[in-house]
């Protein structure tokens, strides 16, 4: 496929208009696959964030009064625009992020459109409630939009995470100031360009910045009624603290160290596919990646032998080539962090079964490519089994019994995803219920459709997205009590 045509320079999107940053500073966004400069983006200042928040509150005066039908029409129109521009948006995402075009075409972009359609349907089916609390008292329960929301998305799924956050905000009648990742701002900026005439001015504002300052301006700003963040647990704690200081809620989708559990009765081909899907999808840069691979002792040797063969066959290549199965890591710093963890694992006694090195031959020379990596002889107490690596590195851990693997799976600070592979439905349900995590897959991995609540427990976050329940997070309950009696209470003198 041909590379996408991009603007040389992108501005901030505030109040329905494209504007330079107030300090007129910019930063460059780099393609991780070849080191080329893709575009320059505006470096937002505190004043820019202020302006965006003011624009959002001004728009909220009108947007909060729109009907469900009007908001649903906007959501459906956005979905149609995404569909119409799928190839362009997919290529922008692959160029900016380094993930293979086959993934962005099949997952990131179409699933984003599906989320807008889903929430359009949700709000059209929502109803309030009324209760008669005795012959003279009627109670009405309504939900009203919470106001202006500050939203920050990560670099690993910049477009899809934008849909996860923006769709319920628009559906609920809220307005947003949206902060992209400094590493991958382009797909959201291109999206804003495509929908600028569909979403009313000020309802959706986009801020960009290359360092932590613009993000910190968001956290410190008193003008938000809610914060929403997807990213690392470390930064998530700062978001939670900022929200707590302002007495506002926060939705946090954070890190993970998920257990991918394989029992001896698993379907072999599905298991091999699920192993790779769990750790190689998006180069392992997935918060719910199946990075702890628990394999029952009776099939361990065969499992390892077959897994190594398949990992070594994975086509690592330039992300815009259709035959590429695994693309580039997000940048050199992340690549070096992953390689450092491989060395830590070796020092702890783990054995590198395959990969563990940079791929830099031929056209990969200028990029941040790694070989798919399996670590064997790992125990669950090693750092490589406890800390989030965020790369294509799976730690294979042997287990004997169901009780043992449940104990090890739950011996983690995180609780975001996980999977169990077995033909025994009773065992599948026992294990799925027994693992302390927000999402468990059975005989599949990394399925993330709309309509299914996704989020973590423990250090993996607070709240659920991709499901209608998130509408409750962006709205507040209001109760209207109506006295139907036609006489005074008699409690005080007439």
Task: Describe the residue ranges of each PLM region.
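ALDH superfamily catalytic-core signature
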Residues: 234-379, 442, 489-493
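Conserved C-terminal structural/oligomerization subdomain of aldehyde/semialdehyde dehydrogenase
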Residues: 34-39, 261, 315, 342, ...
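Glycine-rich loop-to-alpha-helix module at the N-terminal edge of alpha/beta enzyme cores
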Residues: 36-126, 136
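A short acidic/small-residue loop/turn micro-motif
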Residues: 20-21, 26-27, 43-47, 266
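Rossmann-like NAD(P) dinucleotide-binding subdomain of oxidoreductase/dehydrogenase enzymes
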Residues: 127-270, 308, 399
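Hydrophobic face of amphipathic alpha-helices that form TPR/SEL1-like repeat modules
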Residues: 1-33, 357
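Short, well-ordered beta-strand elements within core beta-sheets of diverse protein domains
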Residues: 37-44, 59-65, 151, 260-263, ...
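Residue-level signal for inorganic ion chemistry
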Residues: 35, 71, 93, 116, ...
């Amino acid at each position: 496929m041909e590379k996408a045509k991009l603007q040389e320079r992108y501005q901030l999107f505030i109040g329905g208009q494209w504007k330079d940053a107030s300090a007129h500073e910019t930063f460059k966004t780099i393609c991780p696959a070849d080191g080329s400069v893709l575009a320059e983006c505006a470096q937002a200042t505190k004043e820019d964030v202020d302006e965006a928040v003011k624009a959002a509150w001004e728009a909220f005066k009108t947007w909060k009064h729109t009907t469900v039908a009007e908001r649903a029409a906007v959501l459906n129109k956005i979905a149609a625009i995404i569909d119409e521009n799928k190839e362009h948006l997919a290529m922008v995402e692959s160029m900016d992020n380094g993930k293979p075009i086959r993934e962005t075409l099949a997952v990131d972009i179409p699933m984003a459109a599906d989320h807008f359609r889903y929430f359009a349907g949700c709000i059209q089916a929502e109803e309030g409630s009324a209760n008669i609390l005795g012959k003279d008292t009627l109670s009405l329960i309504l939900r009203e939009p919470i106001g202006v929301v500050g939203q920050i998305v990560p670099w690993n799924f910049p477009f899809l995470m934008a849909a996860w956050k923006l769709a319920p905000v628009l559906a609920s009648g809220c307005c947003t100031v949206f902060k992209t990742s400094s590493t991958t701002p382009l797909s959201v900026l291109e999206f804003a360009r495509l929908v600028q005439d569909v979403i009313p001015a000020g309802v959706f504002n986009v801020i960009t910045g290359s360092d932590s300052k613009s993000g910190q301006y968001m956290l410190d700003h008193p003008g938000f009624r809610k914060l929403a963040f997807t990213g690392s647990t470390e930064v998530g704690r700062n978001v939670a603290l900022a929200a707590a200081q302002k007495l506002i809620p926060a939705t946090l989708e954070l890190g993970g160290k998920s257990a991918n559990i394989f029992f001896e009765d698993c379907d072999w081909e599905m298991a091999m596919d699920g192993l790779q899907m769990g750790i190689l999808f998006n180069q392992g840069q997935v918060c719910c990646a199946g990075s702890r691979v628990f394999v029952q002792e009776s099939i361990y040797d065969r499992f390892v032998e077959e897994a190594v063969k398949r990992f070594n066959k994975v086509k690592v290549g330039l992300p815009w080539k259709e035959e590429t199965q695994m693309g580039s890591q997000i940048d050199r710093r992340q690549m070096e962090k992953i390689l450092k963890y491989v060395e830590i694992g070796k020092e702890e006694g783990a054995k590198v079964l395959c990969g563990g090195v940079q791929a830099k031959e031929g056209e990969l020379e200028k990029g941040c490519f790694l070989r798919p990596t399996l670590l064997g002889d790992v125990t669950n107490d090693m750092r490589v089994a406890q800390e989030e690596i965020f790369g294509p590195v799976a730690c294979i851990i042997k287990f004997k019994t169901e009780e043992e693997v449940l104990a090890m799976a739950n011996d983690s600070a995180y609780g975001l995803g996980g999977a169990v592979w077995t033909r025994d439905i009773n065992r599948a349900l026992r294990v799925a219920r027994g693992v302390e995590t927000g999402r468990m897959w059975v005989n599949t991995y990394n399925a993330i459709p709309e309509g299914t609540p996704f989020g973590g427990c423990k250090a993996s976050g607070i709240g659920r997205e991709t499901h209608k329940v998130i509408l409750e997070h962006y709205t507040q309950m209001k109760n209207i009590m109506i006295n139907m009696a036609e006489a005074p209470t008699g409690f005080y003198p007439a």
